[in-house]
């Protein structure tokens, strides 16, 4: 019998863990071995991270070998290993940041572990507060933030010691401690003993104490990091920030966050990194396509292969620069899910007036929105347009209007008048030679905001409390198939209410120069929409909302603190009226969302997520793509230094970055056509296989890159599912989507050309 078989035999028969190879432990080779550098002076955090990973590796091996054992220790470890692994990985990730931990914090955590071993019923929070009080009155933010991670590391070490010695009591104490740590309010402890918390509480604007706990923690972390880079004490740096804020007269600059976040070296570094990212994305494909053209003697072929190379390199560039930056954090004011009077909000759903049978379904959707977001000063409005017709009035208009009014009145009576109905009249659209709502969705939002600001309107129906509408400060615009998650509206408003996010409008240029006129959420595909048929499963993947919302990566938002507006988000009514009331030409814009984001400055709130529908057929998908591409080519006028509005030539004041957003859309729109052209050209030029592969990879590069990343990060287990589910696994979805994109390349190219020339 070999050694491995002997280990398995001994563990299963007698569960004697001494036969396992001893691993790196906090006591033997971690904390105790490095006592001089950690216990007395300080120990590098990377050593703690290493010890956690070693202990988890040991526990994983123990759980695998002893899964059939009847020992009590094995039962504790095997049943709770995934809990320990999850907590341990989070702690190890925390300690990857290179900082030094104070002696006092580690001593307090050791005492805490000893007390818990003696009496498991003792309150962890009270013991920590008692220990902190006995050591010092104030602590630096880094040490306090490390409390849960250090306790987790020690608890995992206790579990591993129990496994090594076959001691069920130690294993049980370690597992129970990990479970109890999740219920400890560390934020309260950190706030109580943090030196920077006490100083920032004197914020001249008074906004610091109104912020969410996550935002205050972010401020403290930034303060600690900036102080460490300067080589000064955290308390000293916090006082410097406070003094700068006190010396300001501008309300925005009197908030400590302006000097801490807006004027930080980190923000300037990310801004510079962003322009390197933009230059790399545009320059690398140009260099590569030029070199290929020169080496092959076909200088003209660079025009065809530039875009395929651009799209091929896109995921690599985005991934590389995302690793150099960090997810953007959107600061928020604490609203506790209740929208205050000062931030009164209207949820507006622009749509076409439904048939009498569809009116009930639309109102049911509005009631769903209300059910998840009803706390505070918030209203819900159906902003309906009559369908396009040959005349100003049609015979079935009255029946449709009466049916929808009846359903909205029922909702108002049921929920206390929180629902509104606005119907616009038809006007002649000269460019289309038909009658419809003025400027369609853009016109509907613009006319609603004009009514809120002036009280004047040309609506044929306005059902609801006009006074409430006139007092609204924010407008949350959604589509008729968009679903709000619980308290999503309040979360967006809490971001908009923060002083750093309030829009600053340049009255001369009619553009937002700081803050945000639009706060946009993450938009995901609804699970039900993603599971309709094979087409939606291929195009949308799993769909659904992420149950563990956290800030996620978005290249432009992370580096430039601004993103592209996609049509769904919270609009500041005053900023919109001041910037876009009459700044855009009439009947010349189809894709207005990206332009609205360019004028109003759109910020992405990455921890708020909405659910949206998707086309259920190839025809519907191509129709939408054609419409978007047409709009993108119409927006090419905004790449010029001047635009024509109302017959007058005006200076184009949108930022250069927004022009990059516009050109980026054009590049994506032309990609199918250029990839198809490259594949066709491969039959007539030297090195045909290279050009053929380039055309194929240009279409499927994003999906293939994500597939490789999923395999490398999630191993081959990502190819299977651990439960029954109608949607595809991530890897299956990526493979099928790349294959689908290649097989439908001709159709996609035709849609691209049609949208460009129409």
Residue locations for each model-derived region?
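Catalytic core of nucleotide-sugar-dependent glycosyltransferases
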Residues: 22-23, 30, 536-555, 620-645, ...
């Amino acid at each position: 019998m070999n050694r491995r078989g002997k280990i398995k035999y001994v563990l299963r028969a007698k569960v004697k863990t001494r036969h396992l190879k001893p691993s790196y432990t906090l006591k033997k080779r971690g904390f105790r071995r490095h006592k001089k550098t950690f216990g007395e002076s300080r120990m590098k955090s990377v050593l703690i991270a290493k010890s956690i990973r070693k202990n988890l590796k040991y526990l994983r091996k123990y759980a695998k070998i002893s899964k059939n054992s009847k020992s009590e220790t094995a039962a504790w470890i095997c049943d709770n290993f995934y809990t320990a692994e999850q907590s341990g990985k989070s702690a190890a990730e925390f300690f990857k940041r290179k900082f030094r931990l104070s002696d006092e914090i580690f001593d307090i955590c050791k005492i805490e572990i000893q007390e818990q071993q003696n009496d498991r019923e003792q309150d962890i929070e009270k013991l920590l507060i008692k220990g902190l009080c006995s050591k010092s009155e104030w602590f630096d933010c880094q040490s306090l933030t490390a409390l849960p991670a250090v306790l987790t590391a020690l608890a995992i070490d206790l579990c591993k010691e129990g496994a090594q010695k076959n001691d069920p009591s130690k294993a049980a104490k370690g597992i129970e401690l990990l479970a109890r740590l999740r219920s400890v309010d560390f934020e309260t402890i950190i706030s109580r003993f943090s030196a920077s918390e006490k100083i920032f509480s004197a914020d001249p604007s008074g906004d610091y104490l109104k912020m969410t706990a996550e935002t205050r923690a972010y401020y403290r972390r930034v303060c600690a990091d900036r102080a460490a880079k300067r080589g000064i004490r955290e308390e000293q740096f916090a006082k410097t920030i406070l003094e700068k804020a006190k010396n300001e007269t501008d309300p925005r600059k009197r908030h400590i966050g302006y000097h801490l976040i807006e004027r930080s070296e980190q923000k300037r570094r990310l801004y510079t990194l962003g322009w390197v990212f933009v230059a790399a994305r545009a320059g690398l494909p140009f260099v590569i396509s030029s070199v290929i053209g020169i080496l092959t003697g076909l200088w003209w072929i660079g025009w065809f292969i530039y875009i395929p190379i651009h799209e091929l390199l896109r995921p690599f560039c985005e991934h590389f620069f995302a690793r150099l930056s960090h997810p953007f954090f959107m600061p928020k004011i604490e609203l506790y899910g209740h929208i205050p009077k000062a931030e009164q909000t209207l949820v507006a759903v622009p749509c076409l007036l439904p048939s009498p049978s569809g009116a009930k379904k639309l109102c049911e959707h509005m009631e769903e929105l209300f059910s998840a977001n009803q706390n505070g000063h918030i209203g819900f409005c159906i902003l309906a347009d009559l369908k396009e017709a040959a005349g100003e009035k049609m015979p079935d208009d009255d029946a449709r209007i009466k049916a929808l009014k009846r359903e909205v009145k029922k909702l108002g009576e049921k929920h206390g008048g929180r629902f509104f109905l606005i119907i616009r009249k038809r006007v002649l659209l000269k460019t289309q030679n038909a009658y419809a709502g003025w400027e369609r969705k853009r016109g509907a939002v613009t006319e609603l905001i004009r009514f809120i600001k002036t009280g004047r309107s040309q609506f044929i129906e306005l059902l609801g409390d006009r006074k409430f509408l006139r007092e609204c400060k924010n407008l949350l615009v959604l589509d008729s198939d968009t679903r709000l998650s619980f308290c999503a509206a309040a979360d967006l408003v809490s971001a908009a209410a923060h002083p750093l996010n309030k829009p600053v409008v340049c009255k001369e240029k009619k553009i937002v120069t700081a803050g945000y006129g639009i706060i946009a959420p993450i938009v995901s595909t609804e699970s039900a929409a993603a599971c309709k048929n094979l087409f939606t499963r291929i195009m949308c993947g799993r769909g659904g909302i992420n149950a563990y919302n956290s800030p996620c990566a978005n290249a432009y938002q992370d580096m430039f603190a601004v993103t592209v507006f996609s049509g769904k988000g919270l609009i500041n009514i005053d900023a919109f009226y001041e910037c876009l009331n009459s700044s855009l030409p009439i009947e010349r814009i189809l894709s207005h969302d990206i332009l609205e984001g360019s004028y109003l400055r759109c910020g992405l709130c990455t921890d708020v997520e909405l659910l949206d529908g998707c086309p259920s057929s190839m025809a519907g998908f191509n129709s939408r793509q054609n419409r978007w591409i047409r709009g993108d080519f119409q927006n090419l006028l905004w790449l010029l230094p001047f635009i024509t509005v109302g017959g007058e030539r005006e200076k184009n004041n949108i930022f250069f970055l927004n022009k990059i957003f516009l050109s980026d859309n054009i590049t994506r729109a032309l990609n199918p056509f250029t990839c198809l052209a490259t594949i066709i050209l491969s039959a007539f030029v030297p090195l045909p296989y290279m050009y053929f592969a380039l055309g194929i990879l240009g279409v499927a590069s994003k999906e293939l890159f994500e597939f490789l990343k999923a395999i490398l990060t999630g191993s081959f287990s990502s190819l299977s599912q651990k439960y029954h589910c109608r949607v595809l696994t991530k890897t299956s979805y990526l493979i099928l989507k790349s294959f689908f994109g290649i097989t439908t390349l001709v159709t996609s190219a035709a849609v691209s050309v049609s949208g460009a020339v129409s």
